[in-house]
From Swiss-Prot:
Naturally occurring in which organism (per UniProt): Enterobacter agglomerans (Erwinia herbicola)
Domain of life: Bacteria
Annotated EC: 3.2.1.21
Family affiliation: Belongs to the glycosyl hydrolase 1 family.
GO molecular function: beta-glucosidase activity
Protein's UniProt name: Beta-glucosidase A
InterPro entries noted in UniProt: Glyco_hydro_1 (IPR001360), Glyco_hydro_1_AS (IPR018120), Glyco_hydro_1_N_CS (IPR033132), Glycoside_hydrolase_SF (IPR017853)
Catalytic residues of the enzyme: 177, 378
Keyword flag Hydrolase: yes
GO biological process assignments: cellulose catabolic process
Alphabetized UniProt keyword annotations: Carbohydrate metabolism, Cellulose degradation, Glycosidase, Hydrolase, Polysaccharide degradation
Length: 480
């Protein structure tokens, strides 16, 4: 099923009972209201509103006015009409702790409790993310995730969320996309210095490797600490973490150096997290790489065991595309990977469109990591020039094909025993895509940023039909 082969006979009936069909968003990307209700400043307010790293006039204050109840009630009605039975959204650390450390801002509690009440009134179950990149500016200045004290910062914040929302919410995503957050922040800091990277250093190498591995360890420890607090207090429900996984591939004529680099990239981006969570250790090859380079990654005795023993209740998987890796030509370092984009691959904004690698990922988790409960916390795509509003419609054919083929791939993996319990499209709406600003659209719902008018796209229509149990295939993704 490579590159959009026909998905035959696929219906929502091919998934387990009580399956979660949803869409996802993140607070910073949709809410707007930069200075509303006592909110503090995150590092992203600094990057975009003050330093304009996404371009002139691109401000986080625009967004989708999702803090406006009149507006979000209309959005909830759209979700209901599509047939969603769940919606994933995030809280903001900088809203609850405006200065990163001080008293809790209780106005945030009231807002989100009302939002959850409104979701549930529409029959939509909340999946709540605690942290989606909104590090308070003060904590970022103190080192952010590179600082081991971030474990305690996050644990204290998580305890506030659990205390105020565990009666409304029974599933929490603790942290979203550690590897992508770290890479995007590195890129932002480079841009502040007038330097430009063609791509975020999502495949960490060179000087970025120490920062990345140290941050990854602290993020996993922070998740473990939050889970420990959850258990001590006896809250009911499940905790997970949303991790971006990248199947790592090489080309047919790959050299031994290409394959060696690909193996290490897999270790850094995939096995680093899965091995710690489900085996209680970090990958030996990655630890050796760090030791050989004399890197201070702050992995202390007992760290990986603590992460394993936390026993998170589900694994959140964010899947977009695989990475094709080769060894850089004329590189002086033994480990010198680079991402390539083979010409024969159909490409979305995030890389090659490969639903077969989605299946491979789900079945790898099944076979190598004990088949834990899995929720697909993000899956989606954006395509250059596709999201055009014409005569009141957006015929996003490529996104529609992407979703149909990836849902079909998921269904086939479920039939082969993968323990997948939910699926969330990224994203519900077009939104602010970090350093890309508003030019990269990923939503199933088109947003006119000037008027805030919403228009469901073709992909939303077809996704709704899948949820309702209609028999859908690629041929349904056709424009009028």
């Amino acid at each position: 099923m490579k590159n959009g082969m026909l998905a035959l006979g696929m219906t929502a009936a091919d998934v387990p009972d009580n399956f979660l069909w949803g869409a996802a968003s993140a607070a910073y990307q949709v809410e707007g209201a930069t200075n509303k209700d006592g909110k503090g400043r995150s590092v992203w307010d600094y990057y975009l509103d003050e330093k304009h790293l996404a371009g002139p006039g691109i401000s986080g204050a625009l967004r989708l006015t999702f803090t406006d109840r009149d507006q979000y009630l209309k959005d909830i009605q759209l979700f209901k009409e599509l047939g969603l039975n769940s919606y994933r959204f995030s809280h903001r650390l900088d809203t609850y702790y405006p200065d990163g450390q001080g008293p809790v801002n209780l106005r945030a509690v009231a807002h989100y409790r009302q939002f959850i009440t409104d979701l549930e009134a529409a029959g939509i179950k909340p999946l709540v993310t605690l942290y989606h990149w909104d590090m308070p500016e003060s904590l970022s200045a103190a080192g952010g995730w590179e600082n081991r004290e971030s474990v305690e910062w996050f644990q204290r914040y998580a305890e506030v969320i659990f205390a105020n929302f565990s009666d409304q919410v029974d599933q929490f995503v603790l942290i979203n996309e550690p590897t992508v957050e770290v890479a995007t922040k590195i890129m932002a800091e480079k841009r502040l210095k007038g330097e430009e990277l063609t791509l975020p250093p999502i495949v960490p190498a060179g000087s970025y490797l120490e920062t990345s591995l140290k941050s990854y360890n602290h993020i996993l420890l922070a998740s473990a600490a939050a889970a420990e607090s959850f258990k001590v207090k006896g809250y009911k429900g499940r905790l997970g973490i949303a991790l971006p996984f990248f199947p790592v591939l090489t080309t047919e004529n790959a050299s031994d150096e290409d394959k060696a680099d690909a193996r290490l990239v897999d270790g850094i981006l995939n096995r680093w997290f899965l091995d710690a969570m489900y085996k209680g250790n970090y990958p030996a090859d990655v630890l050796k790489l760090a030791a050989d380079r004399h890197l201070n990654i702050d992995v202390q005795p007992g760290d990986a065991e603590r992460i394993h023993d936390a026993g998170l209740g589900f694994l959140g998987i964010n899947y977009y595309a695989p990475f094709f890796i080769r060894h850089q030509k004329n590189a002086s370092e033994v480990y010198s990977p680079e991402i390539i984009f083979p010409k024969n691959e159909k490409l979305a904004f995030n890389g090659a469109v490969r639903p077969d690698q989605f299946s491979a990922l789900l079945e790898r988790v099944r076979d190598e990591y004990g088949n834990p409960p899995v929720i697909i916390t993000e899956n989606g795509a954006g395509f250059e020039g596709e999201d055009q509003l014409t005569n009141g419609k957006v015929n996003d054919v490529n996104r529609c094909l992407y979703l149909v083929d990836h849902i079909h791939a998921m269904r086939e993996s479920i039939a082969r025993g993968a323990n997948v319990q939910g699926y969330y499209v990224w994203s519900s709406h077009d939104n602010l895509e970090w350093l890309s600003g508003y030019k990269s659209r990923f939503g199933m719902i088109y947003v006119d940023y000037d008027t805030q008018k919403r228009t469901p796209k073709l992909s939303a229509e077809i996704y709704g039909k899948i949820i309702r149990g209609e028999n859908i295939s690629d041929v349904d993704c056709k424009s009028d």
